Amino acid sequence: MDAKAKVADWISVQDKEKMKWSVLTSCLYMEMLNELLAPHPDKDDPETLAFVAPLGPKGSAPLIALEDFGKYARWVFDHPNRSNGLNLHVASQEVVWADIPAAFNEATGKKAVYRDVTVDGWFELGLFPDPDAKFGHSAPGDEGTLRTYRENFGGFWRFWKSGKVRKDWALMDEILPGRIKSVGEWMRKSEYDGNIKPLLHDFHQKKRDA
């Protein structure tokens, strides 16, 4: 988030008449509930799936459906007069993690619970073979700027838990009136079942190489 934000900050101070610019700022994808954010069999009841996150009892994080993400990108190019000079922060919903099990149960009929853990506890789920490995496989080498998976994703969770995320929901509704507006709606539309399915190439490549 920091590295991309620095690029966006640099772009945002450019003269938008001499160089028309727009920034599309996203968040985690709802589809990552199939992968990095997928539920696991609960330790107390293997028949129940546990959605695990270090967000506290009522913490939330923004998620966006990839289908709508592409439509927002198309809007940026189709409406240059409105999008010029705009950093459009998009999301489908500010998702309270403790509410996901109820949405999942309603969409699938399956039992689920929310488990709040520490950031270190989240890494103990084994999502990354080595959480302390440097993140950025395409970089030519470690120049002192690369961060570990623990630093990178730990920063994500701490920022979201802080409650400082702000979105212009009215603008997103105006741009895309038929957008997906809740994780429950996305689950029903995508026939989500809680099973792990590949999404991010880099994520699976790293697990294969480990």
For each predicted feature, which ranges?
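Amphipathic terminal alpha-helices
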Residues: K167-A210
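Generic recognition of well-structured, leucine-rich alpha-helical segments
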Residues: Q14, V76-P80, A107, F153-G163, ...
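Surface-exposed polar/charged interaction patches
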Residues: P39, F159-S162, K206
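Oxidoreductase cofactor-interface core, primarily capturing Rossmann-like NAD(P)-dependent enzymes
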Residues: M1-K111
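Generic structural signal for individual residues within well-ordered alpha-helical segments
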Residues: G70, P101, F123, G184-M187
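Surface-exposed beta-strand-to-loop junctions
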Residues: L49-V52, L125, K164-K167
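Terminal hydrophobic/aromatic helix or amphipathic segment near a protein terminus
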Residues: L88, P101-K161
